[in-house]
Amino acid sequence: IDVLKMKYYHFKDDNGTREDLDIPANLMDEAETLRQELIEKAAEFDDTLMERFFENGSLTEDEIREGLGIGIRQGGVLPVFCLSGKKDIGVKRLMEFTIKTAISPAETKSVTKDGNVVECKVENPTSIFIYKTDVEPHLGEVSYFKVMSGHLTEGMDLENPETGDKERLSAIYAVAGAKKEKVTGLQAGEIGCTVKLRAGKTNVTLSQLGSGIAYEHIVFPASKYRCAIKAESQNDETKLGEALSKISAQDPTIIVEYSKELKQTILSGQGEQHINVC
C-alpha cells in the first residue's frame, strides 16, 4: 500500500509487472491513519506547509512531497522502502520517489581534506572520487567513480593530488546495473567507470590539474578475523598471489600480508564467513 498516492499495488509475476488498484476496504482505515501521520510529518519542516495543514486539515500529494523533501535535506526524514531487487518488486516506485522527492546531486556539497566546500556543479573544477574497484573478464581492473564536480570528458588529464601522479581517462562508461555504455563525457552528480587506471584506486580522488581537490577517504571497518592461507602446491603460488591481489583490490576490508615470524601469508577480514565467501 502506497499511502502517498493512496494506491494498492499488486505484483503479478517476478518481472515487476505492477497493477495499481484501489485500497481494499478492510485496509482503508489503517491506510488513512498512516497517511495522516505522513502529512503531519511533512508539515513539520516548513511554516507555509504547516499553515496550509491547519487551514485545510490536509496537504496535496505535491505538498507532501515538498515537505518530505525538506525533511530529507534537514536529516529529519529517513525514507524506508520495501522491495525486492531480484523480483523487481517496488524498485520502480523507489526510483520514482528518488527522482521526484529525494535530494538532487546538484544540491549536494562535499568537503575536501583541507576543509574546503566543493559544490556539485558543472562549472567547478572537475573532480571524481573512486569508490569501488572490480576485476571483470575482458576489461581487467574497472574503477567505479562519482563525478563530484565539473565535467569529465574522454581523454581528460587528471591528477591524484595526494601523490602528484597524472592519469589520462582514455575511456569513460556510464553504468546501469551490470550494463556499461561508452560515453564521451559525464557531468557533476553522475556515476561512471573507467578501466586500467595507474594513479587511481578505491578511495582516491582524481581532480583537474592544479585544483588540489582531494576528498576524505572512506573509513572501512577494521579486520576482526585472521587466518593463514597457502597454495596447495608450489606451482599454484603464483596463481594464489594473483587471486589475493584481485580480491584485496575489490574489497578494501580484506587485508593480505606476509608474516616473517610465522613465514605464512595471513588473510584478514570481517569474519570467517567473509573470508570463505571471498
Residue positions per predicted region:
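Structural and coupling elements of P-loop NTPases
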Residues: 1-278
